[in-house]
């Protein structure tokens, strides 16, 4: 990245973090786990700026509980301390927009969840350049460029 150029702003889905934190609990293939590691390294080094919604912490906590793993408080502290990651609260406008996005995308063939809507609404509200996810429902959105972690390449 050259001087004066700012790092891309990516909305990060919980599955990107979970692929690194608890790789054995993910259904993501190995190349997506390696891609998630690259994404998080770029975030730590400031080559990528990240945003997410507070639901991130709930999703991460749930997987720690489901997998009967310890270490959530350490993971939470690391996420909250990451200088290049902003975790946004779920505001009323964000919650409403997420519901509208869910209504727009959900069908019997596309189980677009309310959480999916929150990630997309967050990315749109913050004018993110892209969303990084392994979720096929988010990969199909049209309002924001969405990529798999393995597709992330630093500019």
Where are these regions (language model features)?
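A generic structural signal for short hydrophobic patches within well-formed alpha-helices
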Residues: 17, 57, 95, 138-139
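Active-site-proximal, substrate-binding regions of enzyme catalytic domains
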Residues: 33, 37-40, 55-96, 100
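Conserved beta-strand segments of alpha/beta enzyme cores
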Residues: 49, 84-86, 145
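Residues that scaffold the ATP/ADP-binding catalytic core of kinase and kinase-like folds
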Residues: 19-21, 63, 98, 141, ...
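Short, well-structured N-terminal submotif of metal-dependent ribonuclease cores
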Residues: 1-52, 64-75, 136
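Conserved glycosyltransferase catalytic-site signature
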Residues: 14, 54, 113-117
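Active-site neighborhoods of divalent-metal-dependent phosphate/nucleic-acid chemistry enzymes
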Residues: 85-130
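Acidic, PIN/NYN-like endoribonuclease modules and their adjacent C-terminal/linker elements
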Residues: 1-9, 120-155
């Amino acid at each position: 990245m050259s001087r004066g150029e700012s790092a891309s702003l990516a909305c990060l889905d919980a599955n990107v973090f979970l692929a690194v934190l608890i790789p054995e609990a993910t259904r993501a293939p190995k190349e997506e786990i390696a891609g998630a590691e690259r994404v998080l390294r770029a975030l730590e080094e400031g080559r990528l700026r990240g945003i997410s919604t507070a639901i991130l912490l709930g999703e991460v906590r749930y997987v720690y509980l489901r997998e009967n793993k310890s270490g959530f408080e350490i993971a939470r502290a690391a996420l909250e301390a990451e200088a290049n990651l902003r975790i946004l609260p779920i505001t009323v406008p964000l919650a409403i927009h997420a519901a509208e996005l869910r209504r727009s995308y959900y069908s019997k063939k596309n189980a677009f969840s309310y959480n999916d809507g929150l990630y997309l609404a967050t990315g749109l509200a913050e004018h993110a350049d892209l969303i990084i996810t392994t979720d096929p429902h988010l990969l199909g959105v049209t309002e924001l460029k969405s990529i798999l972690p393995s597709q992330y390449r630093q500019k």
